[in-house]
Regions:
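Structural detector of well-ordered beta-strand residues that form the stable sheet scaffold
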Residues: 96, 103, 133, 178, ...
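N-terminal Rossmann-like NAD(P)+-binding subdomain of aldehyde/semialdehyde dehydrogenases
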Residues: 1-63
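A structural signal for short, well-ordered beta-strand elements
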Residues: 24, 134, 191, 258, ...
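Conserved C-terminal structural/oligomerization subdomain of aldehyde/semialdehyde dehydrogenase
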Residues: 151, 188, 242, 269-270, ...
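Rossmann-like NAD(P) dinucleotide-binding subdomain of oxidoreductase/dehydrogenase enzymes
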Residues: 53-197, 319
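Generic secondary-structure signature for well-ordered alpha-helical cores
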Residues: 7-14, 25, 47, 51, ...
């Protein structure tokens, strides 16, 4: 079933991509990444059941002693709007593969690409009836899903504020919650980095999908010897990136998801300028289309630097040495993704060891994901649980049982 589902994602990629453009404001290349990743998630999940899922345990008694993994029963999946297909299927596929039923609640704004399309693909792939249910809805629906006694594990991807509520509710009902939450990821550009490549990486990390990605590069930490040229190069790229409707024209950035999010972005940008930051590029919008924005001369307390913006905003802060870089990069409640750019890989890895982060990329920006890799953050970015990779998925969607077996009934003195 999962292999057939993977093939269907590939077969219907164009149709499903259109829905991602229409609902989520994706540019076609980003939509293509989502459908390709959905296929890969299904192919990877198809092999999960053949992985060794238990162990033989030594016992002082004359018996066989085993630790084995069993399905939890029903898994509740709550997925967001920004990458609606990837962030749903990465839990749905492995949960099904490991013998569970799934109840999926997509964001109402992306109910087709993050929910109904998934149900249709699995239906066409031959998934038995009743194993996957889709419940589009708002906060009330999510609360009901977490509280339902049939749901034993909750997989949630969304904001840190919402994740805290999900975690609290799950704890009250004594069920596991796997939380992948917000971030304010740093890209650290060391003094020996290739400037042109660094600027390109920084632009991609901050402006891809309008900055509406949990691991978006939200903070640019640049060595003081490169900072002026880095800001100029990043601002030039921002000024020339086309913004518009990806359903009608070829653009680099599409629309912000709604007016509420657009207004939050603009409020943080204007508050940052009021606090002394210099607007090097952008800072304006037309409807839901927000120009990619570069802020220079920021401080650690500048609003767009200190908070997760979830928009196409690149605040640039300078540092003088590695100690200052480590302190600045680690000076946040979040710990999702980190990028470090340097010609000296050993130096970059040593710096990475000093900065708490669930994901680290040496000589790359902060946005990356693969079906085979464990994904998740620390601190306010998550509970340390992981999505992706066989070990993480088995841990997330099964329970451990201790099983002993004897050939005859044990004799006792009573």
């Amino acid at each position: 079933v999962l292999r057939r589902a993977g093939g269907l994602w590939e077969q219907h990629a164009a149709e499903l991509g259109d829905w991602l453009v229409r609902e989520a404001g994706s540019i076609p290349p980003k939509a293509g990444v989502e459908t390709a990743t959905a296929a890969q998630e299904c192919y990877e999940a198809a092999g999960l059941a053949s992985h060794p899922l238990g162990e033989i345990i030594p016992s002082a008694q004359p018996r066989l002693s085993l630790a084995r993994r069993l399905p939890v029963g029903v898994v509740g999946v709550i997925a967001p709007f920004n990458l609606p297909l990837i962030l749903a299927i990465r839990s749905v596929a492995p949960a099904l593969a490991l013998g569970n039923a799934v109840v999926l609640k997509p964001d109402l704004r992306t109910a087709v690409s993050g929910g109904l399309a998934i149900a249709r693909v699995f239906e066409e792939a031959g998934l038995p009836e009743g194993l996957l249910h889709v419940l589009p809805g708002g906060v009330d629906t999510g609360e009901a899903l977490v509280a339902d006694p049939h749901v034993r594990v909750v997989s949630f991807t969304g904001s840190t504020a919402a994740g805290r509520k999900v975690g609290e509710a799950a704890a009250r009902h004594l069920k596991r919650a796997h939380l992948e939450l917000g971030g304010n990821s740093a890209l650290v550009v060391l003094d020996d980095a290739d400037l042109d490549l660094a600027v390109s990486a920084g632009a991609w990390g901050s402006f891809l999908h309008q900055g509406q990605i949990c691991m978006t590069t939200g903070r640019h930490l640049v060595h003081e010897s490169l900072a002026e040229r880095y800001v100029a190069g990043l601002a030039e790229k921002a000024d020339h990136l086309p913004v518009g409707d990806p359903a009608k024209e070829q653009v680099a950035l599409g629309p912000i998801i709604d007016e509420v999010q657009r207004d939050k972005i603009h409020s943080l940008v204007t508050a940052s300028v009021d606090a002394g930051a210099r607007l090097a590029a952008g800072g304006t919008y037309d409807g839901l289309f927000y120009r990619p924005t570069v802020l220079a001369e920021v401080t650690p307390t500048t609003p767009a630097y200190a908070q997760e913006v979830f928009g196409p905003v690149a605040p640039v802060l300078t540092f003088g040495d590695l100690d200052e870089a480590a302190a600045l990069a680690g000076g946040t409640e979040y710990g999702l993704s980190l990028g470090i750019l340097s010609r000296d890989v050993t130096k970059a890895m040593a710096l990475a060891d000093r900065i708490p982060s669930g994901i680290v990329h040496i000589n790359d920006q902060t946005v990356a994901d693969e079906a085979v890799a464990p994904f998740g953050g620390v601190g306010a970015s998550g509970t340390g649980s992981r999505f992706g990779g066989a070990a993480a998925n088995v841990a997330a969607f099964t329970e451990t049982q201790w099983l002993t077996v004897r050939g005859d009934i044990t004799r006792y003195p009573f």
